[in-house]
Amino acid sequence: MRFRAASCTGKLYHVDLYAVAGDVDGLEPGVYHFDPDSGSFDALREGDYRGALAEAAGGQRSVADAPVTFVATSEWWRNAWKYRERTYRHAFWDSGTVLANLLAVAHGTGRRATVVTGFADDAVARLLGVDPEEEAPLELVPVGSGDPVPDAPDVAAIDPDEAPLSEEV
């Protein structure tokens, strides 16, 4: 029996993960699909495509300087045959459950990770080699940073010099 760390509506597991990797120890730069049955990343493209992904995300710095960005997708048919019009809603519920685990692991190992929802869908789908009518990208999760994040200084409280409007009238 397969073990999944994140639940999914109806145990249909329609959320897939891809990795767009560049500077990752033990992994050649490329685009990979995660196979949960074997626990492996299967290469789809060789080479560093992080620039293409960052461009599709509007040049967001978190995507541009991440050593790896994970992309969550949903294969519509895996959920649609059973849940029909609720499929779209389930895509985001279930991907959120998967991504919560990814974020917890990233932060637990001291790596920056954020969820990015603003990107050009077709460009990301093309990079992954998927047809958005069958499997669509939902979120990007850049993990890590090419530049170390400095320690944050102590943040003092802000005490603005304001007078209540009622005192000025």
Predicted feature residues:
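N-terminal amphipathic, basic helical "cap/leader" segment at the start of enzyme domains
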Residues: 1-66, 126-128, 151-169
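Solvent-exposed coil/turn segments that connect beta secondary-structure elements
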Residues: 22-24, 75, 146
